[in-house]
Amino acid sequence: MQKEATATSHKILFLNTLAFTACFAVWMINGVLVTYLATNQVFDWGPIEIGWLMGIPVLTGSIFRLPAGMLTDKFGGKPVFVILLFICAVPMFLLSYANDFISFALCSFGFGLTGASFAIGIAFTSVWYPRKLQGTTLGIFGAGNAGAALTTLFAPTLLNTYTANGTNMEGWRMLPKVYAAMLVIMGIIFFLFAENKKPASSNKTWVKMLSPLKNIRVWRFGFYYFLVFGCFVAFSQWLVPYFVNVYYMPIVTAGIFAALFSFPSGVIRALGGWMSDKHGARKVMYWILGTSTLISFMLIVPKMDIYSPGKGIMAQRSGIVTRVSETEIDVEGKKYPLQVKPTTFENLDDQVLVFPTKEVWQESVVTEGQKVLKKELLAKGVTRIYFQANVWIFAVLVILLGSIWGIGKAAVYKHIPDYFPEEVGVVGGMVGVLGGLGGFFCPIIFGYLLEGTGLYTSCWMFMFILSFVCLVWMHRSIMKTSKFSSGLE
């Protein structure tokens, strides 16, 4: 770390953030591209195949974050970042020639290395700034997560343009070529303008560099990051098919809504860094995990239209049914009024309904001339419950959740320079690995949950459980170490 920030520090921060934004945009391309190809039946892929193709790039990027962080600590960020950008451009370009699931998966595995750029940028940014600015600067760098929003916002429009609005589906192959060119251009810019710098620990052996991984705190931070980053990555992709299938949106519109989730989450990360510097990461994380638990719980209830047996009418005495109408049943002079089906549910989708709506009515089950006994059913009750899961309310909650996770991402990484100032690359890489694994496993888990339950909201059930476990683990850990804590945990 430097004692003071300089103009060179700010230049490196800008280049790191720019390169990370480009890499993150590439990393998230399958969320849009795979959904587009499956929706338009270019390839016959179901939810599980889609989940795997979304997860494979994230897996690659996650696994290689640790070695990327170690290489950055050893050789500095410039050579590692430049090599990564050029290498990843190759499989990104080859994706344009993929014709089946296997070739798509192999190319996705290759360009997924762009996800390792996070560990490089974290370590390379950290060495240029003093400890007091670590939260803010790492938060600014992390705003490169907004690259996901750039993909979900612009890639659907580009796909429509290249395919002539679906009349030439082979035109999709142009999109990977454009993304590959972006990586090459970014690599050239980084090579020409970045300056290299190594941390003081660069002379350590590889084994010595890995020693912090014995500390349980590293794994706990990684578990938090599994939620706030891994799930952010997962939903940056999963929300596109979510909006398409649940709210019947065109893919371009779904991409815009997904971008509204991912863009604020990326940009607000800088605010999370500032908040962590000012108030302490512990307080911020309490708020993040508690709010994540609450919002996830609120999103669990699915969009539904349920019919259930309600309060019926039974005969008070035996007799012959003399008249049956929509409003009344007459049994030898004994009249039984019926609740008529209301018109409450007409044009419900044109309204904004926050809570479930109910209507109740009764329908005759007897006919004129029929003999009925005492307590025999004359009319059955019907209860209809409709929950709109209004798209605007859903979108607001999802955007709020994404923004909260964005602040949480910065809060998690605020801990690392404080506890491991000379091993930021290794520890940051390992935490990034665990967080990135969330981005890999979650779309796959979502796919299996969807297959098993038939409910798209099953993913929010998983988020609720995960958020609650993180909150409990953090609280128990803080209680155990509070007498030794200095305010950062």
Place the predicted regions along the sequence by residue:
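Cytoplasmic helix-loop-helix junction between adjacent transmembrane helices
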Residues: 107-144
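Extracytoplasmic
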Residues: 11-39, 43, 152, 235-240, ...
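Extracytoplasmic gate region of multi-pass secondary transporters
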Residues: 30-34, 216-268, 300-304, 409, ...
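C-terminal membrane-cytosol helix-exit motif in multi-pass small-molecule transporters
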Residues: 180-200, 470-478
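C-terminal ends and interior cores of transmembrane alpha-helices
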Residues: 86-99, 291-307, 384-387
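Conserved MFS/SLC helix-loop-helix module at the cytosolic interface between two early adjacent transmembrane helices
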Residues: 63-101
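Glycine-rich segments within core transmembrane alpha-helices of 12-TM secondary carriers
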Residues: 135-160, 432-442
